[in-house]
Amino acid sequence: MADVSSRATPLASARREIVRVCRKLYERGLIAGQDGNVSVRVGPDRILVTPAGLSKADVKEGDLVEVALDGTRRRGQRSASSELAVHLVIYRARPDVGAVVHAHPPTATGFAVAGEPLPANALPELVYGVGPVALVPYETPGTEALARRFTPYLEGHDAWLMANHGAVTAGPTLLVAHQRMESVEHAARIILAARGVGQVQALPESSVRALDAARREHRIGGRAQSRRPLKPDG
């Protein structure tokens, strides 16, 4: 099991990173309006999360809210994100997770609205860099019931589509969680384009197994080992 303290980011660094990633999510069209939320583990039992009711394009370091894993606000003037429960259920179950990103990437969310999972065997980069993307059944956003929907899908997944809602990604660091969100949306665009041209061709099963094994072998709790992995670069 991963050491939770090894996934904690110093508070000052976490504040800067969250603001930077919020800007990127907005600028790249992965969120709009007051959509989305971002959090980072800053201690064994606490996280830093974006506030409710504020555009992520405008969020500042002082707007962020420090919350205990039991949901108690420890520091901050604003209310924590309405999707706090989803973040907390991931952190509690996954000590390897150091950051969580929730966004509404248009194409990936289109798959979620259609009730269509992303194929787990179509793109080497998705198999290796993200792994299988779970499709979580719909529940009202901002509720504990939605967080409970995640429970069967927490182990073995670092990315989730929420039916009729959006996407969530997790990683050992905010950089990785954000990259996974971009990868999920990029994969969704490619798969949609492929369906417009013809039929999505699955990778050979042997290739999927090899890529999945490489992802597992060269990552410890989601963190890449120092030796160079077998990584697709095409």
Give short role names for the model-derived ranges:
Residues 1-234:
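Glycine-rich flexible loops
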